[in-house]
């Protein structure tokens, strides 16, 4: 009975659902022999001795993917037809040999059946083991994809081109492409599928033929089709071949990222980019604004000490509700501003009497002590005797009232280098220097005018 079926296939789908057709190898009952004995339509002229009792060796070349294509077309045609009783006209293509039946039935059928089952199981194991074909491994070893930031799915991203099936038998029955069902129909996806880099002749893309739907139609798909739920499968399905040049590789990587971000089941990478951008915007420092009270207290501290210690900085930060870093930066900026002001004051353009006097506080009015005390001579008084006479607001014995509270003066050695600038002697010397510079400039201007207008 092992040689009665000349159209044996491993999937046995035809024999499973069509009970009205001739029995297969597994139906080793008396009904099968009676069926073949009752049939009278067998012609010895059409008998081929080599077409049965012989199973070809399993081949795993590229042509094996289309070995059963015509048989699947015939299966679909038989499924469309209603089931009927077996007649000679209904199955004319099956040639039933009855000569070899008595010889095979005399032998023990159980060992043959077990051998066939073992052969089928071994074939299934081999197909599962070599699901990734040797040509694929050879292509990956000879042409490895380098410098990829992702984990490539080599089953879908191999460099493979196969021939199309015959257009006469599959022109109107080809199922839609796998990308149309699972990939998002974005413009970038359509451009990638219809890019001119892919061949448009007799060679088609690897995914266009090896999609799970078409593999199920050809009957070669052993394992269930992968679902597009994992990031690797989702990314691997949307592209076909790895890039060959750096430009193509960057385009393919960008297309993977865009397609994965737009798919419904994938993680939203654009949300991460927006979050990073918003974090960068928030991390930009804003300009610190100080209140009038804070500015006044900082100016008072800067007047006494241009450089403050860390202990004093901590006290000021606690009193003004600021951070130590803000106070440190404020003092740095204030020192730079003071240096810039002194540089501008020392320049010849700012040495006018009225302009310079307007920049300085009224020293003559503030330098006068109360009338009850004798007036000291300015040129005989040392610098350390009265260091803060120019600013009586910080002295407890003064009669003038200000908004900020009175403070006791710090030790005299803190402000000694800066007291000389606010004495009347220093003010008079500076005015004399400015007047001397103005006289020199006027003389130079007169000399240049005389040389210009009194030409020979």
Swiss-Prot record:
It is found in: Nucleus. GO terms for biological process: negative regulation of transcription by RNA polymerase II; periodic partitioning by pair rule gene. One of its GO terms (cellular component) is nucleus. Keywords: Developmental protein, DNA-binding, Homeobox, Nucleus, Pair-rule protein, Phosphoprotein, Transcription, Transcription regulation. It comes from the Eukaryota. Pfam families: FTZ (PF03867), Homeodomain (PF00046). Residues 338-380, 400-456 are annotated as: Disordered. GO terms for molecular function: DNA-binding transcription factor activity, RNA polymerase II-specific; RNA polymerase II cis-regulatory region sequence-specific DNA binding. Gene3D superfamilies: Homeodomain-like (1.10.10.60). Residues 421-443 have a biased composition (Low complexity). Residues 283-342 bind DNA. InterPro entries: Antp_homeobox, FTZ_N, HD, HD_metazoa, Homeobox_CS, Homeodomain-like_sf. PANTHER family: HOMEOBOX PROTEIN HOX (PTHR45659), HOMEOTIC PROTEIN ANTENNAPEDIA-RELATED (PTHR45659:SF22). May play a role in determining neuronal identity, may be directly involved in specifying identity of individual neurons. Required during embryogenesis for the process of body segmentation. Homeotic protein, required in alternating segment primordia, it specifies the correct number of segments. Belongs to the Antp homeobox family. 'Fushi tarazu' means 'segment deficient' in Japanese. This is Segmentation protein fushi tarazu. It comes from Drosophila hydei (Fruit fly). The lineage of its organism: Eukaryota, Metazoa, Ecdysozoa, Arthropoda, Hexapoda.
């Amino acid at each position: 009975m092992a040689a009665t079926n000349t159209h044996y296939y491993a999937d046995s789908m035809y024999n499973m659902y069509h009970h009205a057709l001739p029995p297969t190898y597994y139906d080793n009952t008396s009904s099968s022999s009676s069926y073949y004995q009752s049939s009278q339509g067998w012609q010895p002229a059409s008998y081929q001795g080599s077409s049965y009792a012989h199973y070809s060796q399993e081949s795993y070349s590229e042509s094996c993917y289309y070995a059963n294509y015509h048989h699947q077309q015939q299966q679909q045609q038989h499924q469309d037809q209603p089931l009927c009783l077996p007649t000679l006209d209904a199955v004319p293509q099956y040639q039933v040999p009855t000569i070899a039946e008595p010889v095979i039935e005399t032998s023990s059928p159980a060992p043959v059946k077990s051998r066939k089952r073992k052969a089928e199981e071994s074939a299934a194991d081999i197909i599962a083991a070599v699901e990734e074909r040797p040509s694929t491994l050879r292509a990956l070893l000879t042409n490895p994809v380098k410098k990829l930031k992702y984990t490539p799915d080599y089953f879908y991203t191999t460099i493979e081109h196969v021939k199309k099936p015959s257009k006469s038998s599959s022109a109107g029955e080809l199922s839609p492409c796998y990308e149309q069902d699972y990939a998002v129909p974005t413009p970038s996806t359509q451009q990638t599928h219809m890019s001119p880099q892919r061949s448009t002749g007799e060679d088609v893309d690897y995914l266009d033929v090896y999609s799970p739907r078409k593999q199920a139609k050809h009957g070669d798909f052993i394992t269930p089709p992968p679902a597009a739920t994992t990031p690797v499968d989702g990314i691997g399905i949307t592209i076909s071949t790895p890039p060959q040049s750096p430009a193509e590789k960057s385009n393919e990587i960008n297309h993977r990222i865009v397609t994965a971000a737009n798919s419904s089941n994938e993680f939203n990478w654009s949300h991460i980019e927006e979050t990073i951008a918003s974090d960068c915007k928030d991390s930009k420092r804003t300009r610190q604004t100080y209140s009038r009270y804070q500015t006044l207290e900082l100016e008072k501290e800067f007047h006494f000490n241009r450089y403050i210690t860390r202990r004093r900085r901590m006290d000021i930060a606690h009193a003004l509700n600021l951070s130590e870093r803000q106070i440190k930066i404020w003092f740095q900026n204030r020192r730079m501003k003071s240096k810039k002001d002194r540089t501008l004051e020392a320049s010849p353009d700012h040495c006018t009497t009225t302009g310079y006097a307007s920049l300085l506080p009224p020293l003559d009015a503030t330098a006068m002590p109360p009338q009850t005390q004798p007036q000291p001579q300015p040129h005989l008084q040392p610098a350390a005797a009265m260091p803060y006479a120019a600013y009586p607001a910080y002295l407890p014995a003064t009669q003038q009232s200000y908004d900020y509270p009175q403070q006791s003066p710090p030790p005299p050695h803190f402000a000694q280098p800066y007291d000389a600038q606010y004495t009347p002697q220093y003010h008079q010397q500076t005015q004399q220097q400015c007047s001397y510079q103005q006289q020199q400039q006027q003389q130079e201007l007169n000399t240049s005018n005389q040389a210009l207008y009194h030409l020979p």
